[in-house]
Every structure is written in C-alpha cells, then in structure tokens.
C-alpha cells in the first residue's frame, strides 16, 4: 500500500506509474501476507500492472500506518524523494541482491542477498558501471575491465566477435516514433513551425504525408545496420493485441507531396525536430535521416539534438511540435502503448500520460476503455486489435521501427536477449 501511495508524489517523472494506481475502491490487508484489491470495474491487467512496480519497505520510511480508504491514500506522511534510494539503508527490498554502494556517475555495487527466498543468484557481487560513450564501452569489454556491455555499436560487431567475444541480440518491444503537436493552434503557438499561419499537424493529410515520406527500410538498413525492424503499429508481432496484417506504411514521397498540396501546403513549411542524442540506439542519426526525408517532400526540417535529460524536460513542457522518442511496453501487450501514447491525456485517470502530442479521438478512447475492462482474453485481444488499427489509420504518431537490442559478452557466460531490453544480473549465468 505504501508503494502505491508514494507513486503520485514522484516529481518530474518522464513516464509516471500513476495509471497503475487508479480505479481502486479499497485496498485491504487482512493479514501480513495478504492484500486484497477492490476495483470499481473489472481489471484484467491488474496483476500485470502491479508486477511492474518495485515494492518499497514502509518500515524504512516510517510509513507503517498508511492505509487506502474510500478517499484513496491516508496517513502517508512525507514520502521519500527518489534520491534517497541511493542509500543502502533506504533501498530495502526482497530481491536476490542488496545495494552495497551507489556512487553517482561511477558505479552501482550489488551484493548477493543471502536471505533471498528463491534460488540464490550465481554472483556474490555485481558492479554496474555507466559508460555512455560507445568507444570506451567497447574498449572496456575488450580490455577485460567489464564482462558484459549493453548496446555495442553495430559497426563494431565484427571486431568484438573477432576478439573472441559474443554478440547476442533480439527484437524488443521498444517502438521508435515521431510525435506531432495536435493541440496548439495557430502556428505562433506551435513551437518551431514556420511558413504557415496554422498548426499543420492538426490535418490528418499532413500527418499521413509525413508517414509516407519516411523510408523505414532505408533507416533500418543504412542507419541501424539491419539491427531493427520497420514498424506498422506500436508493438511487434506476435505480442498480445498485434495484427500480422498491420504492415509499415509504404515509402511514397510523391504521394506525400500530393497530400501536402491537398492540405494547403504545396510549398511545404518549416519545422524543428527535437531528439535526444544519447537515449535510443542511433537516435540522433535516425532523426537526421527522417529530417532529410521530410525536407525532400517540402517540409524543411531542422534537427535540435540534446542530451536525454534536457530533451525529456523540454518535451514534458511541450516545447517541441515534432519530436523523436521511444516507448517500451513493459507489460508486453497492446493496451500499454495505446493508453500511454494515443489515448486522450487525462491526469485524473492516467490515460494518455505520455501523449505529449495531445492527440484525442473519443472513438479510440472508448475502445481502449472497453478493452481495459474486458476479462475474456479473446474478446480483449480483438478490441485491442481494433483500437490499434483505428489509431494507426489516423496517424496520431509515426511509428518508425522496433529496436533490436544487442549485448556483447565475454566467453564463459550466457545471456538471453529480453524483449523489454533489461539487463538482469540474475539472468547472466556461467556457461559456454
């Protein structure tokens, strides 16, 4: 209960978990090992959603008296700030490892939890080192300073394998997409848009033109080195709620120009494309490629690249009318990205919490809500498919590709690529 009560208090969260704390009429704890959730409506995703939350120790923060009544959370007190979890005494959980030391920008050291309730992990100590630059990260692996690295650069695969190391990779549930401002109007209220007196992204024809202008396969092959999959919806097949017939929009620059002309932009317009340059695989390069493709159809596109921390702060303040970002669906089913990215933004319900373009479609919202309260799995999956098809037909955002996530490992250990892109110490194991 303490965990659920704290979630709405977390400041500056780029992707808040508040959507998972809605809809509870009551939460009861009849004994120390039982928790009973009473919801206002059927909630088929409740166990799945709760599994994404890290459970906090109420005792560590003096929150043992907290309760959840008809009015929501009661007796929370002063919840901890995120920075407090950098202290081992506060980072209390029931997992296979314990936090031994955290030094910002240098390392995180975990030690095996000898009192763990499950199988003991293989490693006595695990050290995580943040190495943001690709070159030093690869060099650390080749020198034997580290055993595993995330996201080795594609161009270094041959060098890494030639030195006797392994590459493992697999498709992820992370969609890379372009989002457009579908809220502000006229143009002077639409940041970065020039050459028009209105917001062009409010016109579906403009959004469709942008989609047709993007050569997704060229991005996959030339920018991503084949280590990505072109996207036609928000999750890759065969995850729950996806449709095999939802193919990527075909590259059609002439069709895109025609749509722009029909929308009243025969000479195009100008826009700034915001992007992080250190968050997603080749993010700035992908943004530059997309900008060139849009410029070719008459939308002069200038790229504004920056660190992820700066980008997300500016994005959350709606400073971009067009931006590149990514979304990973932790739940592994279509409800997650539909709720997060294309449902109408509603702080009261948590719907649309990452819909920074503020697209709104009541018909789509109704389908999403119906799917969210449908317990029958087959019926729910069909509703999600309908919602996905409706959304993609209206171009609320432009799906580009799904990341294929690589890891590089030394010989003698194994790791199986995860669709959620997580690197878990418990799943790195000795082996050939």
What function would you assign to each model-found segment?
Residues 58-59, 80, 395:
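Extended, small/polar residue-biased N-terminal targeting/export presequences
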Residues 73-81, 85-86:
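Residues embedded in well-ordered regular secondary structure
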Residues 61-64, 226-246, 405-410:
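Mature extracytoplasmic/periplasmic domains
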Residues 1-16, 26-30, 38-45, 85-91, ...:
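Extracytoplasmic/periplasmic ligand-capture domains
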Residues 48-49, 334-336, 410-413:
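Short conserved micro-motifs at the rims of enzyme active sites and ligand-binding pockets
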Residues 17-75:
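Surface-exposed binding/hinge segments that line
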Residues 400:
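Glycine-rich and polybasic anion-binding loops at the starts of cofactor/ligand-binding domains
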Residues 407-432:
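Long beta-strand-rich cores associated with HINT superfamily self-processing modules
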């Amino acid at each position: 209960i303490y965990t659920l009560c704290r979630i709405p208090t977390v400041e500056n969260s780029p992707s808040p978990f508040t959507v998972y704390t809605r809809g509870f009429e009551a939460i009861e704890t009849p004994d120390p090992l039982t928790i009973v959730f009473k919801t206002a409506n059927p909630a088929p995703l409740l166990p799945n959603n709760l599994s994404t939350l890290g459970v906090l120790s109420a005792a560590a923060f003096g929150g043992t008296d907290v309760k959840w009544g008809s009015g929501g959370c009661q007796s929370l007190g002063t919840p901890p700030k995120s920075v407090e979890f950098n202290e081992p005494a506060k980072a209390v959980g029931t997992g296979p490892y314990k936090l031994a030391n955290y030094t910002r920008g240098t390392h995180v050291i975990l030690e095996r939890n000898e009192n763990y309730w499950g199988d003991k992990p293989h490693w006595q100590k695990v050290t995580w080192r943040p190495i943001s630059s690709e070159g030093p990260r690869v060099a650390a692996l080749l020198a034997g300073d580290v055993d595993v690295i995330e996201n080795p650069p594609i161009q270094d695969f041959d060098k890494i394998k030639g030195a006797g190391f392994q590459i493992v990779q697999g498709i992820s549930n992370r969609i890379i997409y372009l989002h457009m401002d579908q809220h502000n109007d006229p143009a002077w209220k639409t940041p970065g848009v020039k050459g028009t007196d209105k917001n062009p992204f409010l016109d579906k024809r403009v959004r469709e033109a942008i989609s047709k202008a993007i050569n997704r396969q060229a991005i996959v092959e030339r920018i991503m080195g084949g280590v990505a999959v072109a996207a036609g919806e928000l999750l890759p097949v065969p995850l729950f709620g996806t449709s095999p017939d939802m193919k990527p929009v075909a590259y059609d620059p002439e069709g895109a120009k025609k749509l722009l002309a029909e929308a009243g932009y025969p000479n195009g317009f100008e826009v700034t494309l915001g992007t992080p340059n250190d968050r997603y695989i080749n993010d700035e390069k992908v943004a530059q490629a997309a900008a060139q493709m849009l410029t070719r159809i008459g939308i002069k596109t200038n790229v504004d690249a920056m660190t992820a921390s700066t980008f997300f702060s500016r994005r959350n303040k709606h400073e971009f009318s067009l931006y590149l970002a990514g979304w990973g669906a932790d739940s592994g089913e279509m409800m997650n990205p539909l709720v997060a990215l294309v449902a109408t933004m509603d702080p009261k319900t948590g719907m649309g919490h990452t819909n920074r373009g503020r697209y709104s479609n009541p018909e789509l919202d109704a389908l999403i809500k119906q799917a969210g309260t449908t317990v029958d799995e087959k019926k729910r999956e069909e509703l999600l498919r309908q919602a996905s098809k409706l959304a993609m037909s209206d171009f609320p955002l432009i799906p580009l590709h799904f990341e294929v996530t690589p890891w590089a490992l030394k010989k003698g250990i194994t790791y199986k690529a995860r669709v959620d892109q997580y690197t878990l110490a418990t799943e790195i194991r000795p082996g050939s």
